[in-house]
Amino acid sequence: MKNPFLNSKMKPFILASLSILSIGTLAFYNQKSQLINALRADFLNEGTGDVNDLEVYPGLEISTFATEPMLKNPTNIEVDAQGRIWVLEAYNYRPAINGNPTNAEGDRILILEDTDKDGKADKQTVFYQSKDLNAPLGIAVLDNVVIVSQSPYIWKMYDDNRDGKADRKEILFQGIGGEQHDHGAHAFVFGPDGKLYFNMGNEGKQLLDAKGNPVLDQDGNAINQKNYRQGMVFRCNLDGSHVEVLGHNFRNNYEVAVDSYGGLWQSDNDDDGNKGVRINAVFEHGNYGYVDEKTGEGWYINRTNIEKEVHLRHWHLNDPGVMPNLLQTGSGSPTGMVVYEGNLLPEVFLSLIHI
């Protein structure tokens, strides 16, 4: 069918406009790449990055353990029982949007070590690299088993001969939405009860098992958006069995933190620009209000007893049954949290949640 809005007189104009748009886009990405390269050169020349500009608590100091070219665009780290630092890279994240180059061999999982004990990494081992590793977001290391979160998969990788190289991998879960998206599956955490805890943002949507079957929750219901809303928090056995949904209706809850009593804590990022970033204590079966639990409507829709301030309205805090926020921190996008219960840092940091 001929397009009535496209006549012969308009075609040259449209082609010229598309050409200008293409040239302008290319010029933008070229300028962006030049700027990034210049900043990277300054970063590498100084060898410390921007750590000298960070404000540090009196009596503490911060230093650079590793930087480029040893690692590139890390998204998550883990410290194993030997004190080695495991680094998950997402160098190939969204190249069609950001215009950055990609690594044709795929993203990497690195092991970094400080063999001479000078506080800087001097040994790098590539544990795994493959085209199927595509902008992963989470890593957990349990002895010689590595759990990698990368929508649509959760993988278990095994170092059978303990040489620092992955020997095999298998699917733990699959079918998770959010591939090449930061609202997908996030890192696993080992809890004091011997179970695994993990979460996903609101692009994750569902869990399937290794065979592609729906994973059922503690009540026998399929874990999907028909039975739950938006982002979710989970607990399961080490083999992925007996999955429990502990809370739901988050936007992009990033890496749940588990304390020594089994308490769960996490941050949740708001729709950008609404100063609604929040910290939550996660209680089992909790509805955390990102959308209307019954209708699925967003926070901006008019409703009974609507909150006056946007940052409160954002989480349906006046809706019956919605769990209150522990704290709202304003703007930003937290991407990590830990509950510190050790004694190496000054006492002021004991039993605090660090974001």
Which residues make up each language-model segment?
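Accessible peptide chain termini
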Residues: M1, I353-I355
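Bacterial Sec-dependent N-terminal signal peptides
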Residues: M1-L35
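Beta-propeller domains with acidic blade repeats across secreted/periplasmic ectodomains
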Residues: A27-I353
